């Protein structure tokens, strides 16, 4: 069973290593490696932002296994937020993705009622599609995003079902 805490500035290097891991870059809409100074600036803005939740997941031994980020969209987009996930390569294939998505989504929606969480997933990323489906996300659209065939999946707070 996993637990989570919110990321702090001290987690910047852990997130940097995760974001530049080859499989993470391959499944990102921007596949270029991230430079450290750019990452530090990006990370520090988000860790302090009230519209961004950085969930850091730990296993029973307290070892970080992955992260989920949920960011509220711009004001003009209504009550929508975008989710992203990455799992440490040594913990992939163990079902942690589904558990992380469930825990983060449920926590976010419990403190942000009325929001819809939106996931953009490469069609070829079958593991992520399965994790999101198992975590209660519903396929709402299939389209190209930045030239890549993608699934758009959503999860709403229980009050909206």
Where are these regions (language model features)?
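An amphipathic alpha-helix signature
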Residues: 9-16, 36, 40, 44
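A short helix-loop-beta-strand connector motif used in the catalytic cores of GNAT acetyltransferases and
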Residues: 44-56
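Juxtamembrane/interface motifs at transmembrane-helix termini
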Residues: 34-37, 46-48, 87
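Acyl-donor (CoA/ACP) binding surface of acyl/acetyltransferases
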Residues: 2-14, 18-21, 61-161
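Hydrophobic residues in alpha-helical segments
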Residues: 19, 28, 43-47
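Short, intrinsically disordered/low-complexity patches at protein termini
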Residues: 38-39, 48-51, 141-142, 151-153
């Amino acid at each position: 069973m996993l637990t989570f805490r919110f990321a702090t500035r001290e987690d910047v290097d852990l997130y940097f290593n995760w974001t530049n891991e080859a499989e993470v870059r391959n499944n990102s809409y921007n596949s270029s490696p991230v430079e450290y100074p750019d990452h530090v600036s990006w990370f520090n803005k988000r860790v302090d932002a009230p519209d961004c939740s950085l969930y850091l997941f730990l296993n029973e031994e307290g070892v970080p296994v992955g992260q989920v980020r949920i960011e509220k969209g711009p004001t003009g987009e209504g009550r929508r937020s975008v989710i992203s996930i990455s799992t440490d390569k040594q913990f992939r294939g163990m079902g942690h993705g589904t558990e992380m998505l469930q825990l983060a989504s449920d926590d976010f929606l419990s403190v942000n009622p009325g929001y819809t969480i939106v996931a953009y997933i490469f069609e070829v990323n079958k593991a992520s599609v399965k994790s999101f489906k198992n975590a209660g996300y519903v396929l709402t659209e299939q389209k190209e995003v930045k030239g890549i065939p993608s699934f758009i999946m959503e999860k709403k707070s229980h009050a909206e079902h």
